[in-house]
Amino acid sequence: MAYSTVQRVALASGLVLAVSLLLPKAFLSRGKRPEPPPGPEGKLDRFPPMMHHHSAPSDGQTPGARFQRSHLAEAFAKAKGAGGGAGGGGSGRGLMGQIIPIYGFGIFLYILYILFKLSKGKTAEDRNCSTAPPGNAHRKITNFELVQLQEKLKETEEAMEKLINRVGPNGESRAQAVTSDQEKRLLHQLREITRVMKEGKFIDTSPEKEAEEAPYMEDWEGYPEETYPIYDLSDGIKRRQETILVDYPDLKEPSAEEIAEQMGEIEEEGSERLSWDHLPTDPGAQKDNSVAPCDPKPESCSCCVHEEEDPAVLAENAGFSADGYSEQEEATKENLPQDFTNEGLGVSTDNAHVGGMLRKRNPQGFE
C-alpha cells in the first residue's frame, strides 16, 4: 500500500511523539527502588537482624533495651527524612525529562515541515514541465465547456454563411469578401470543434447533420444558380418594359360619342345638300323631278332628328342614307336632259362631291 507524503510525515511525527513521552517514564521507573511498607513501631521487623540476636528471650524489659530502641527510632527518623529529600530531587529530574523530549519533538516537526515544502516546490515544477498524459485527452467535457463549444460552432456557421452570401457563385464581389486566410482559419476552427464534440460523444451523427455539414467543405463551390439566383438590377433599370393598359382604350381611336357627333354632322350636311338639289329651277325639270321617285327618308330624317339621338341608331341610319343618296343621284342623272346637266354643272359636281364625301367618311364611322 503506497502512502502519500502527508501520510508519511504524520506517521513519523506520531512515532517520535510516542517515543519521547514513553522513554522518560521507563527510565524514571527503573531508577526508583522499591521501599518496604511501613509497619507498627512496636514490632521488631524495623530493626536489622542483628538486633534480634541481641534481644533477650525473656518477657521482662531491661533499661538497656529501652535505650537501644529509642536510639534506633531516632536513626530511622533521620534516615526517613533523608529518603524524603532524595525523593523530591527525583521528582524534579523527572519533570525536566518530560519537557525536554517534547521540545525536541517540536524541533523535529519544524525540520520535517521545511523539507516537505522544498519537496513540494520541486514536484510542482516537474509537473509543469512534463507533458500531459495520454489519458487526459479522452477526459469528459463539462456542460459549461459543451455550451461554449456549441456557441463557437454557431458563430462559425454564421460567419461561413455570410462569407458564402458575399462571394456568390459568379464571384462579382470577391474584392469585398474576406481573404482566403480567414476562410481557411474558419474552416479549421469548425473542423476542430466538430471533432472535439464527436470525441466526447455528445453529438450523434445522423444523415441529416452530415448533409448540413457537407456544404461547408473545401471542395464546395456554392449553390447552383437555379436555387440561388442573382439578379442584376442595373440591367432591369436600363431595359424597362413598356406598360400595357389592358382596360384603357386607344387614344387614336374615336369614342362612341365622337362617332355619333360625326354621323350627325354628316346627316345634316346631306339633308342640306338634298334640299338644295330639289329646288325647282326649270318647269321641265320640276315635272321630271315630280315624276321621278322620291326617297322619303330625308323628310323623315329632318323631322325626327330629336328622336334618333342614339349613337347606334345614327350609325345605322348613316349607312342606309349613304346608299339612298347614291341611288337618288343615279336616278336624277338619268332623268335630266343633257343640256340641263351641262348648264347645271355646278350642282351635279356638288352632288358628286357630296357623294364622295359620304363614301370617304362612311368607313370612319363604321370603324
Curated annotation (Swiss-Prot):
Secretion signal, residue range per the UniProt entry: 1-31
Any Pfam family: RIC3
Major localisation: endoplasmic reticulum
Basic and acidic residues bias: start-end ranges: 271-280
Coiled coil spans: 138-169
Topology feature Lumenal, residues: 32-95
Key words, A-Z: Acetylation, Chaperone, Coiled coil, Endoplasmic reticulum, Isopeptide bond, Membrane, Signal, Transmembrane, Transmembrane helix, Ubl conjugation
Transmembrane segments: 96-116
Biological processes per GO annotation: positive regulation of cytosolic calcium ion concentration; positive regulation of protein localization to cell surface; protein-containing complex assembly; synaptic transmission, cholinergic
The keyword Endoplasmic reticulum appears for this protein: yes
GO molecular function term, any single one: acetylcholine receptor binding
Record topological domains on the Cytoplasmic side: 117-367
Free-text domain note: The coiled-coil domain mediates transient homodimerization with other acetylcholine receptor-bound RIC3 molecules, promoting stepwise ACHR homomeric assembly at the membrane.
Subunit structure: Monomer and homodimer. Interacts with CHRNA7, CHRNA3, CHRNA4, CHRNB2, CHRNB4 and HTR3A.
Descriptive protein name: Protein RIC-3
Organism: Mus musculus
